[in-house]
């Protein structure tokens, strides 16, 4: 496997190994944020606040689908990482094969289901009448491109499980730049309105996914499977789905709470949607960085668990906790100091009302970034040793907390209660995961280092 330029995460100083792996992922996530920001900025500044609200009103449901895709493909990647850490090339190839099969079948089901549910989804989200048609157009096109999202995440998670976090970064950078160019072309000279922004996103990701797959096949000989290895194995698929589906559902459950928040914001009106969307876009900066380190710790823990190195797992988790705490403090301070520049990035001559909605969100959520970092670290560490029930239970608790604030407390306390739903959900989920992590690590230290069966 050395010829494949894979990376062994079971050796070296934990924080250096994790940081070296995570930095390209952070770079990729920042570019991903860049093109979503560019998407919103181009839409808002060329088409107006209503167009920005139309795109923003779909953000949560698009993220909901994306989270399930990332969870499903990420779960498959965990098993691949464990096999790679154990040096079992046969299982690595089996994992690659079944990941492709699962991705192909899932793409068909997901695309048909999502495209047929656009109207019910928009009604559920209380989408305002004045932006309904634009919102429908944007969301339907994005759903048509689900296949590109599935296969990009599939190949990215396969490569990361093999220790390569740079190749996905390079193609994400390409996709980001292409997306911005297509945004401008489709919206300005072609006058395609929000449909242009949607098609730009879909085409950019599809091209990136295709090129990434071709490049990976040329670079990594371990991905060259024989016809026999491509045969579908129900047993192998079930092993992957037992990890992938709980992770997908877990990440989607988190988004259900965000859907409740979006619905509550939509009830307030277009100004609230615009302010909430602008603040949420820059808030994603910290979330994406934390998620990138979470991907790093997931692959690190999976490989070391496969190699039976429990001490390295504990050190790596602690090092990640310290890194994220420092980064979240710095990013939080930057966002709060620069909050007055957020809305003008997306809307020309914004009203005072839109500015206030954005400010309220940031000053409510940003001070609690510490809990987000800890949540992502402990959740991914627990998942990567094969335990899926605890992270899923934590997500159910998180869902209940978000719905309580967004749907119940927002009635008497208004918009601020919707904003507070996010940090409150982080804290409640973390209260379960930390004790579970401590107990789990003690059991593994006691010699029970076989893969957890759920």
Protein language model features and the residues they cover:
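Transmembrane alpha-helix boundary and packing residues in multipass membrane permease domains
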Residues: 25, 29, 41, 78, ...
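Short alpha-helical transmembrane segments in multi-pass integral membrane proteins
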Residues: 1-22, 80-147, 189-245, 301-368, ...
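Small-residue-rich hydrophobic transmembrane alpha-helices
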Residues: 52-112, 149-168, 275-339, 372-386, ...
